[in-house]
Amino acid sequence: MRILMLGWEFPPFISGGLGTACYGLTKALSDLGTDVLFVLPRGGADRQLHRVHVLSAGQTGGRDAGQGEPRTYWTVDGLEHVRLISVDSLLSPYQTERTYTEQREREARGRQVAEPGDPEAAEAAAPVPAPAAPAPTSQGITGGPSLYAGDLLGEVHRYARLVAEVARHNDFDVIHAHDWMTYPAGLSVSALSGKPLVVHVHSTEFDRSGTGVNQQVYDVERAGMHGARQVICVSRLTRGIVTSRYGVPEGKCRVVYNAITINGEPIPTTVERIETSDKIVLFLGRITMQKGPEYFLAAARKVLEVMDNVKFVMAGSGDMIRRMIELAAAMGIGHRVTFTGFLRGDDLEHVFKMADLYVMPSVSEPFGLAPLEALQRDVPVLISKQSGVSEVLTHALKVDFWDINEMANKIVAVLRHPPLQKTLREHGAFEVRKFAWLDAARACVDVYREAAET
């Protein structure tokens, strides 16, 4: 079976759980022999990938469009049945209207300051790393402006046009679209090709925005869900939102839980644990309303009222980080809270090595991969009951996100009672092995077949 997959991000350039999930699922599909063409927007990240073929909105219907299939693809070691192609779009994961506008302004400033002979400025301003203009007979679609007038939704629809051009030159059986920014593209390609669309709901506007829902984004999500042949939800929690808030028939929805890469051995790392007399409690994730960072700090203050040898680490970035720094200071606990910014690689392994407990206080978490990553690294976890992962994880402490007293009590219990911490660590590390991407991939293949047959 051949899948045209539309996503926001793909390793090594990731900013959150969506990229990790896309990679895990795509690799497992490849291991099952499923052919995947993965289309993703440039978003500024993949300009370092010199072998990525980039389409530009300036010539989607131009002279080169009819000259044949674009033949320069990005291939990834270990993914035998996967090809990736990047389209020249500023879309990026977890984007909002404000962050989209800021990104356009940054790229515009880069163009303004780029001077001849200044390679760093030129590289910052360039839409793609093209060392020379293509010959007139070269295949593919290139050129055209990469900075667009208009808003984020306009960019979403421009991305849809570029994806439709990719689809014209490739054969596939099913379209698989991840989250709302790719839904219009999926609908467009489905209408043009007659092939079934499967949308994958990793989060909804209600998860991201609470009561402050953006009506236009909601409309895009709803149109994608209703226009799709099948809807994959990452949890029963998400399925409930999809059916109750978007009016999608329950029989059209399939729950496919996320997973984690399982190697059968502890994760290899050269990172040493930094010895400290303090207990370390870790928050790891985007610092946004959805993740509940203010509840983490409120619980931290209560913990520090009864324990003075605890430090709280907030690892991540997001639109609430400045507010959380100010809140920690206002609470009088700023000296006990460390904000690290976004972490990856060895820096991420360092904080896991230091952590005595990982806390996920999310207000609304469709799934939540970070607790599985923590358990895989022998870190016990305390998770919000308002999360998808709480449906399937047994050996974890659970709490309502708003119950800061109970959250603080459970943090103290783990830190003060080593046998409890040891039990959670050992049982959790064993339990996490059951979350395999191959199982998720097999479930998706079943959905593809059902979509293709109906």
Region roles according to the model:
Residues 232, 273-300, 425:
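Conserved donor-binding/catalytic core segment of Leloir-type glycosyltransferases
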Residues 323-343:
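Nucleotide-activated donor-binding/catalytic signature segment of Leloir-type glycosyltransferases, i.e.
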Residues 363:
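Aromatic "clamp/platform" in nucleotide-sugar-dependent glycosyltransferases that forms part
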Residues 237, 259:
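Carbohydrate-associated surface elements
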Residues 380-383:
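Short hydrophobic beta-strand element within catalytic cores of glycosyltransferases
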Residues 34-167:
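A conserved catalytic-core segment of Leloir-type glycosyltransferases
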Residues 396-404, 413-418:
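Conserved acidic donor-binding segment of nucleotide-sugar-dependent glycosyltransferases
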Residues 342-343, 350-355:
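Short alpha-helical donor nucleotide-sugar binding micro-motif in glycosyltransferases
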